């Protein structure tokens, strides 16, 4: 009886989580199959990066969208940067790789918090604009640089990049769009 009571308390959480996942999947412009493929590819890319035995000073973050991989973070030197690219390109299913890692020390926790706040501010501004579907765009921030990826038309891409470049705190915007046909 106690187990039944405990399990029934979990039901609302399971239902809410399932509804959230379903809504996010439905809003994404990629097909469900593409979303699953990207999720699987992201796991394989992460594994390849961890197996590449990059030095502990390297902080490489991968973002996968439409089979394309965007690398951000910090690496100690160009050799490590090239090793990260090589590791990603060895993964079957990677269509294209943008290596936007920067040479230097890893960013501080304070900068990571600032970047999270900046990304949230950008997403809010994009969400409030009537001509942008936030579900089509991924926003990645790294040391006040903003990296945009997603499925857009050339005009949408220009408009979003321009809007993001005017957000307070943004030092630079780099786009890695997949263009709609």
Q: What residues fall within each predicted segment?
A:
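N-terminal targeting leaders
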Residues: 4, 9-181
């Amino acid at each position: 009886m106690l187990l039944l009571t405990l399990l029934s308390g979990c039901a609302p959480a399971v239902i809410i989580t399932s509804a959230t996942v379903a809504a996010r999947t439905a809003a994404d412009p990629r097909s469900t199959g593409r979303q699953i493929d990207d999720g699987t590819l992201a796991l394989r890319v992460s594994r390849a990066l961890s197996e590449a035995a990059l030095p502990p000073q390297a902080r490489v973050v991968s973002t996968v969208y439409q089979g394309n991989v965007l690398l951000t973070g910090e690496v100690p030197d160009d050799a490590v940067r090239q090793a990260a690219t090589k590791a990603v390109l060895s993964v079957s299913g990677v269509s294209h790789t943008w290596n936007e890692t920067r040479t230097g020390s890893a960013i501080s926790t304070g900068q990571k918090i600032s970047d999270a706040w900046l990304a949230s501010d950008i997403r809010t501004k994009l969400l409030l604009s009537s001509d942008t579907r936030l579900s089509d765009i991924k926003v990645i921030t790294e040391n006040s640089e903003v990296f945009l990826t997603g499925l857009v038309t050339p005009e949408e891409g220009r408009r979003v990049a321009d809007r993001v470049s005017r957000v307070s705190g943004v030092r630079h915007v780099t786009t890695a769009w997949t263009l709609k046909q």
